[in-house]
């Protein structure tokens, strides 16, 4: 959450609304689940504790993956640190950027597909909070949790609708329907789930920098959904 203050100041300077948010990697019975937490409280002790535990595990995992990948590709921990900049933690995108800079892959997406994905021999799992616990923690702190790219099955296993029902019961507020990894059929199915469970229908570019194909401004959240998310703040 270190960049939220700077982002808020920049948004104010250019006259646009700013919605603070973080993405939290979680699990459900071995399946990776990503939560978007809008309007998080950076000082709330429960959020701080959850993120600190996850951050430490991510760094340990990144170091082990660098050791594995470095045996076959031009990659060192120092390379990764150069690409992580002032980030609070080190994750797979930083490994991907270092591999691209070394000429091992053309794009970040290529690096993920070949060596960084969950089905890769180089992949190392790491601790992530159980998603239902994470939702309760976020809601208890006043944040607004949204399930990110719930149908992105090209990335690995996805949870079934019954789990989304459990998440909604735990306090989930929104379901990210509009996403580049969702087909039109998936978007329709997810929109129906969101309506049935009274979840806010959202969208997002999932833009994490220039290393991926995602473009700012694609798959946006509607003004009505934005207002519904604002109304859900604790």
Question: Which residue ranges define each predicted feature?
Answer:
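Charged catalytic cores and adjacent phosphate/nucleic-acid-binding surfaces used
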Residues: 2-42, 51-54, 106, 129, ...
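Conserved acidic, metal-coordinating active-site core of Asp-based
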Residues: 88-152
